[in-house]
Regions:
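Short, conserved SAM-binding segment of the class I
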Residues: 2, 136, 140
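Residues in flexible loops and secondary-structure boundaries
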Residues: 101, 132, 181-184
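His/Asp/Glu-enriched, well-ordered alpha-helical/loop segment
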Residues: 34-64, 117-121, 139-149, 153-186
Length: 186
């Protein structure tokens, strides 16, 4: 691909259409609604994201790309990135997290079920179901497997949040206003 010749990093979300279709089939078979609460644990679980990462790793190596490994949340994905870095692959690994993830890892700091935007006091509910493996994540940060800490797309404003339409829900709101201070200080 053209990007390989330019020395740029290629970053692709570690998921594919087969994964999404498998979630759809699972929900139908179990008679469950197509809601974010039902979709996210399956779409962003260790098996799905790690499998997507292995496919990306194959593509990256085949085409001699520099890889920006996004959303390194799960043990299987982290183990893959760690192994490939040890083999000399040029990988920039990032952890895009939410204040909800951070607060879930440190429940002693969680004083509410809402997130408050400091500028105007607007409140939105907390919640994310990706279920990161926090012991593995922070070990990877400390050892240098993860290079970048960033913020994820969420949280969602109530007006943009459509839990019954998970593939049409808004990608979220600007993170700095809502939780930049938490990411930097938590």
């Amino acid at each position: 691909p053209a990007i390989a010749g330019q020395g740029k990093y290629c970053g692709i979300h570690p998921s594919d259409e087969r994964c999404r279709q498998a979630v759809e089939r699972r929900l139908r078979a179990d008679g469950l609604p197509r809601s974010l609460a039902q979709v996210l644990p399956h779409l962003y679980g260790d098996e799905e994201m790690s499998a997507g990462a292995w496919l990306l790793a194959y593509y990256v190596r085949k085409h001699h790309l520099r890889w920006h490994a996004l959303h390194c949340w799960h043990r299987g994905y982290l183990d893959l990135v760690r192994m490939l870095k040890a083999q000399g692959e040029d990988i920039l690994a990032s952890l895009e997290l939410l204040p909800t993830n951070t607060l879930a890892a440190h429940p002693e700091n969680r004083h509410s079920e809402e997130l408050v935007r400091p500028a105007d006091g607007l409140r939105i509910p907390l919640g994310h179901t990706a279920g990161p493996d926090w012991d593995a994540v922070w070990a990877a940060v400390r050892e240098g497997t993860i290079d970048i800490l960033g913020s994820d797309h969420s949280p969602h404003l109530p007006a943009c949040y459509r839990p019954q339409e998970p593939f049409r829900s808004s990608a979220g709101v600007p993170g700095l206003d809502w939780y930049g201070h938490l990411l930097l200080n938590e």
